[in-house]
A protein has these predicted regions:
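Polytopic transmembrane helical bundles with strong interfacial aromatic enrichment
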Residues: 1-178
C-alpha cells in the first residue's frame, strides 16, 4: 500500500506540474482569453506549492513512522489540494463554456452548504487521526489485546467518526440532488 501511495503522489505531482506549465503558457499567450481569469494561473501555481508541501509531509510521515501531527497536516493539505483542483476544474469549465453559464446566478445556499461540507470533512480528518492515535496508545499499553478488543477499549467518541462519515455521504447526496 505504501508503494502505491507514493506512486499515486508522484502521478499527482507530475500532473500538477503539467497543469502549472500549461497555465503559465496560456496566460502568456492569452489562449482562449486566459488573461481575463488570473485566478486560474494563481490557483495552478498554488496547487503546485501545496502538492510539494503535501509530498514533503508524506515523506516526513513515512520517516516519522506515522506521527499523528504529521499525518493530520498531510491529510489537511491533501484536502486543500483537492479543493484547489476542484476550483480550477469548475472555473476552467465555466471559462470554456461561458455561453452555458450566461445569466446563471450564484446560489448562496449551495455555497454555504459546500463550505459546511468542507468544515465537516476537516472535523472528520481530525477525529480520524485522533482515533488512530488513541488506538496506537492502547496497543502500546496492551500489546496482547486483539485488534477488535483494542477498538472496544476506545471511548464512545469513536462512533462519532463513523456517524459523521455517513452524515457526510448523505449530505453530499442531498446537495447533489437539490
Amino acid at each position: 500500500i505504501e508503494y502505491g501511495n507514493r506512486l499515486f503522489g508522484v502521478l499527482v505531482g507530475i500532473s500538477i506540474i503539467v497543469l502549472t506549465v500549461l497555465a503559465i503558457y496560456y496566460y502568456k499567450t492569452n489562449y482562449n482569453n486566459f488573461r481575463s481569469h488570473p485566478s486560474l494561473l494563481f490557483s495552478s501555481v498554488l496547487s503546485l506549492i501545496v502538492v510539494i508541501i503535501t509530498g514533503l509531509l508524506g515523506a516526513e510521515l513515512v520517516w516519522s513512522v506515522l506521527d499523528t501531527f504529521i499525518k493530520t497536516l498531510h491529510m489537511l493539505f491533501a484536502l486543500a489540494l483537492v479543493s484547489i483542483l476542484s476550483y480550477i476544474c469548475i472555473k476552467s469549465y465555466k471559462m470554456i463554456n461561458a455561453k452555458l453559464f450566461r445569466g446563471l446566478k450564484k446560489n448562496p445556499i449551495l455555497s454555504k452548504s459546500l463550505i459546511f461540507l468542507w468544515v465537516l470533512i476537516v472535523i472528520e480528518i481530525l477525529l480520524g487521526t485522533g482515533i488512530r492515535t488513541n488506538l496506537e496508545l492502547v496497543s502500546i499499553e496492551n500489546p496482547s489485546l486483539p485488534k477488535g478488543e483494542q477498538l472496544n477499549a476506545l471511548s464512545p467518541y469513536k462512533y462519532l467518526h463513523s456517524l459523521l462519515g455517513f452524515g457526510l455521504l448523505f449530505f453530499s447526496i442531498y446537495i447533489n440532488y437539490h
